[in-house]
């Protein structure tokens, strides 16, 4: 409200100049209008520019005539007189204008609030089914995955218990006759009389060195030794030593945490055994591959290899 009246004051200052000509024919009507709202208009002829004193007609006109100019906190009466279209027209009290503008604002504001209240439920009603559908799908998928994971873990634990039981049985059997030898009776040939090729001797040396490094928890050095041994075994076309070198490479990579590369070398052991129709070392290869898949989190493949490993432990 204060902002509107200030704008009016500034407009009156900028308009300036002489007041518009007075319409004498409407003077009686102006007097009646001023008297009806409880104010009288007093004109001082000597002042320039002309202004009006607004004096209340119902209470002590003489006392108010001396100090009867209407005081307002917004703008001077002289500046408001310049803005008036007719000289000498009395003004309504400012609180009356404030009440009118306030009522108009109050009539407009509730409509906007009502429109906002009407729009909000529509958007929320449209969005709630979508949110509920997304939450329902997420809960369903999460429950299925958790149930599947739980079943795989239970199956894996059962397989590990079977492996431990088979290993304990095998250890008991071996403890009955630890010094029993199934080699034929005969004189042992001294090592000095055994003729070994230089490459074969180097191959055996690399395999022993690699095992020593594995035993000493040095898998990087063991990998280097087993790699050379594998190349020598392949050049000599010795499948038995080739499987030993491949098994050593898989073990060294497995201890370094390189499980996918380790699976490749353990699978090489299985391929050589299948090619040569010779089963030595494949039981350990199945168990090592299952361990690698377990570390990678692929429990389904790990379970398959554990099943094969358990079956071979029970038949060996």
Curated annotation (Swiss-Prot):
Deletion consequences: Loss of ability to restrict the accumulation of protochloro-phyllide (Pchlide) and delta-amin-olevulinic acid (ALA) in the dark, leading to a strong Pchlide fluorescence in etiolated mutant seedlings exposed to blue light. Rapid bleaching and death of plants transferred from the dark to the light, mediated by singlet oxygen production and enzymatic peroxidation of linolenic acid.
Coiled-coil segments: 144-175
Signal peptide boundaries: none
TM region(s), chain numbering: 125-145
One of the Pfam families matching this protein, by short name: TPR_12
GO biological process, one term: chlorophyll biosynthetic process
UniProt keyword list: Chloroplast, Coiled coil, Membrane, Plastid, Repeat, Thylakoid, TPR repeat, Transit peptide, Transmembrane, Transmembrane helix
GO cellular component: chloroplast membrane; chloroplast thylakoid membrane
Assembly and binders: Part of the FLU-containing chloroplast membrane complex composed of FLU, CRD1, PORB, PORC, CHLP and HEMA1. Interacts with HEMA1 (via C-terminus) only in the absence of light. No interaction with HEMA2.
UniProt name for this protein: Protein FLUORESCENT IN BLUE LIGHT, chloroplastic
